[in-house]
């Protein structure tokens, strides 16, 4: 899953695109490198990012989705939003196929009803707190168990509402310390009990560059290591900034598994 941020302030500068020419160039690059789906986001979730009104988020998404339809109409497209009205617009008007909700329905209580009505796949992500508060003092007794239970409860609720095409995302970096992130990664296999596909988003995040020292721009090597570990531990989808490196990691893991 290649990341397309139609924002001016996402945490990794290399993923920011605002103008149609930039969006088109980014999409062509990801498609050529082997992206199998595109995730379009118009609201930066990094702590301290400027708030964006629903109207502005929709305007950005309309612009981005229009270019996606032009460049790669054959690829599935997810829309990265926690707002139900934005999700509805993106699917019904913009042609998005999947809703990717970083808040797991917690920041807009209409989200579950909306995706059930849209009958589209839904990416359910765990986050403790909100983007503004999530890194102030995250606390868990057992992060792997608590994240698994949290996801399981919401998957059950979604099933009861008629939403059955669900992908689970443990939410690396969202309301978790460095130690929490690596404990969660170490126990990633625990999420197999959810019996849904697993998405992992660790690309160029602080769990890479804070551990190694450096910045998001210097975090590709560490990201590739985490992608490899995630695939070996059962991840089905990688949400990535650097498609070529992720595709190569996937090919190597698949070759190892084929010959094991």
Model-derived features with residue positions:
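Active-site-adjacent loop and "lid" segments of alpha/beta metabolic enzymes
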Residues: 11-29, 45-63, 67-70, 76-78, ...
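Short polar catalytic/cofactor-binding loops
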Residues: 5-9
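N-terminal glycine-rich anion-binding loops that anchor highly charged ligand groups
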Residues: 1-2, 29-42
């Amino acid at each position: 899953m290649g990341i397309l941020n139609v924002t001016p302030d996402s945490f990794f500068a290399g993923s920011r695109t605002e103008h149609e020419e930039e969006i088109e160039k980014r999409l062509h690059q990801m498609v050529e490198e082997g992206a199998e789906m595109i995730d379009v986001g118009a609201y930066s979730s990094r702590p301290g990012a400027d708030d964006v009104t629903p109207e502005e988020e929709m305007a950005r998404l309309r612009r981005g989705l229009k270019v996606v339809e032009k460049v790669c109409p054959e690829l599935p497209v997810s829309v990265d939003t926690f707002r139900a009205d934005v999700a509805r617009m993106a699917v019904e008007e913009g042609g998005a196929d999947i809703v990717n909700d970083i808040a797991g329905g917690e920041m807009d209580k209409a989200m579950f009803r909306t995706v059930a009505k849209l009958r589209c796949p839904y990416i359910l992500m765990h986050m403790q707190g909100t983007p503004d508060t999530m890194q102030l003092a995250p606390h868990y007794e057992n992060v792997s168990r608590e994240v698994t239970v949290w996801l399981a409860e919401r998957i059950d609720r979604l099933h009861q509402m008629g939403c059955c095409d669900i992908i689970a995302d443990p939410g690396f970096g969202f309301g978790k310390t460095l130690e929490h992130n690596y404990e969660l990664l170490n126990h990633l296999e625990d999420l197999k009990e959810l019996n849904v596909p697993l998405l992992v988003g660790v690309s160029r995040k602080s769990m890479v560059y804070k551990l190694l020292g450096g910045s998001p721009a210097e975090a590709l090597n560490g990201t590739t290591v985490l992608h490899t570990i995630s695939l070996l531990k059962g991840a089905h989808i990688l949400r990535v900034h650097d498609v070529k490196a992720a595709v190569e990691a996937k090919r190597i893991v698949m070759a190892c598994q084929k010959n094991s």
